[in-house]
């Protein structure tokens, strides 16, 4: 059952859900598939259970999901697409799960506002990746389709340092 699946995954403490009168705010740190894709199978199971959870919430009221989803969804979301095809966070399987999430009734807020903009939210500490802007867009605000028209702005603040990630912002009029 879905409850069992959530209990199976809950011990890692990756999801925090806040209920507001008009919407749910879900913060998530998606499992990384790791070097050698050691956790890819677990990740696929987790993605299905998490999507089912979001759909349960969405049946009650709109959902705003934010967090490190550990996937660069499209080639525009990663600097070196060709050389990262089998890297954790850019496998066909992980990207397909993001496609499934969006197809289930959700909108990538940054892409909705900036369909062609190349901007990243994460850079490896290795190889001076941030200096070279060799990054990945793996941090998102995803919203229920029925509130997507209320998005006023969606930004990535890559001018902010202090982490291998930078802040992402959503301005939505609910």
Residue map of PLM features:
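Surface polyanion/phosphate-binding segment centered on an Asp-His-Pro turn
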Residues: 155-174
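Beta-strand-turn-beta hairpins that frame and shape the catalytic cleft
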Residues: 13-29
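Surface-exposed cleft-lining segments at the edges of enzyme active sites
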Residues: 6, 31-47, 82-86
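Short, small-residue-biased leader/transition segments that mark boundaries at the very start
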Residues: 1-4
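Short hydrophobic/aromatic beta-strand or adjacent loop that forms the aromatic wall/cage
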Residues: 12-17, 137-139, 165-169
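Metal-dependent phosphoesterases centered on the DNase I-like endonuclease/exonuclease/phosphatase
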Residues: 46-134, 138
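Short Gly/Pro-enriched turn/cap motifs at secondary-structure boundaries
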Residues: 6-8, 130-133, 158-161
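Short helix-loop capping/hinge motifs at secondary-structure junctions, enriched
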Residues: 25, 147-150
